[in-house]
Amino acid sequence: MTSSGFLRAHPGVVRRCGFTRGGGLKVGPCALTDPGLAWVHAYYTDEALNWLAGLDNPLWKSGADVMDLLPGDMYVSEHVFKKILSRVGPEFFDSFIPIREVEECILFGFSPLSSTGMAALKAIDLVYGGYAPAAPGIPMEVYAWEMAYKIGAAPRLLRWVLIEGEGIEQFATLAESGLRGSLRDYIGTHPSGCKTPMDLGLVVKNVHGLVAALGMLMDSNIYHGDLKIDNLTVTEPGGPYKLIDFEFAHPFEARMRPMIEARGPITWLMPGTPACNPPEHDEETPCRDRRMKELGVTWQLGLIMLETIVLDEALVRDENMEWKRPDFKRLVSAVMEENGSLAPHDPRLLEGYLDLIGECLKRDTAVRMDLVTLMTELSLLIEKFKL
């Protein structure tokens, strides 16, 4: 293995004994003493370890906050590291130190290439996805991600590779991570159990920016395909909201040449997330009406707008839509009061925002608010309340 970055040209001996007594692995104000991370010292240079120890983050108040901000279920083992390294090559790890992982296919860690200092490497078997019609040879996921990044609507995609193998292909990406995983994580609970009260004015401005970005992408024939709060993040305190996970990105007609077979374009079905799909969504039939497609995006934005202020996934994604009742506003206000999700605000601003949510979440597409009107109404709220 050769390296010109953080990785050692020749790995050292993994010394689990004494790892804890030696202070473990230092990440900013945090010392990780689990011996399962001893391999990091063996594979990464002193320069990399010193960089990791000197990391800072505006949300780190103590060592306990470091791991609280980093997603993942468990620490990355040497076995998992070597397995992914053999798949994607050292280039991915020369500027990325993985610490946590999910199902051995998504690694979360730290990178000097990221504006937040944090990054995520995703390496999965390729069972879905096509090439961008507007950029031959470039996966639609990459094309959409980079176009979104250019307009400030996505974190930076640092590296990607399509790995061809015997009978199966894999796709790997390395990208900036948000300050605290997804938007839900960012506005969710702290270790103390307390919610992070949100500034409603800031929420309105961030949603306005998101709607504008989605409109620009759709004007470029790019549809995200899986809009939900889990696929949004923030890379700066307070916002803006940025899109992540472009796996289902597609052009309007959803016709793309597959990445896994050497054949012509096919029409893809867009599964998305069932609980977040609009009522009119048909998993078996691609949408052929641009207005209907846009109204589906409006529905998904309504769910995002709702969940951002109530912080209650079960309520928002209830398949029976129990929240969609005549006393909708009273129900939402009660949940918000119980969750303590909003900082003190002008009740008239909340009233106007809830009105927009209600308009976005009308089941009848004939009366559901369209994207242009939503953009206009959000602009009026920003102007009226001097946000």
Swiss-Prot record:
Positions annotated as active site in the UniProt record: D226 (proton acceptor)
Domain (Protein kinase): residue spans on this chain: 82-381
Stored InterPro entries: Kinase-like_dom_sf (IPR011009), Prot_kinase_dom (IPR000719), Ser/Thr_kinase_AS (IPR008271)
Entry superkingdom: Viruses
E.C. numbers: 2.7.11.1
PROSITE patterns per UniProt: PROTEIN_KINASE_DOM (PS50011), PROTEIN_KINASE_ST (PS00108)
Entry keyword set: ATP-binding, Kinase, Nucleotide-binding, Serine/threonine-protein kinase, Transferase
Binding site for ATP: K122
GO molecular function: ATP binding; protein serine kinase activity; protein serine/threonine kinase activity
UniProt catalytic activity: L-seryl-[protein] + ATP = O-phospho-L-seryl-[protein] + ADP + H(+); L-threonyl-[protein] + ATP = O-phospho-L-threonyl-[protein] + ADP + H(+)
Keyword rRNA-binding belongs to the record: no
EC class of the enzyme, as a word: transferase
TM annotation in the entry: none
SUPFAM superfamilies: Protein kinase-like (PK-like)
Family as reported in the entry's similarity comment: Belongs to the protein kinase superfamily. Ser/Thr protein kinase family.
Protein name per its UniProtKB record: Protein kinase ORF16
Source organism of the structure: Ictalurid herpesvirus 1 (strain Auburn)
Gene encoding the protein: ORF16
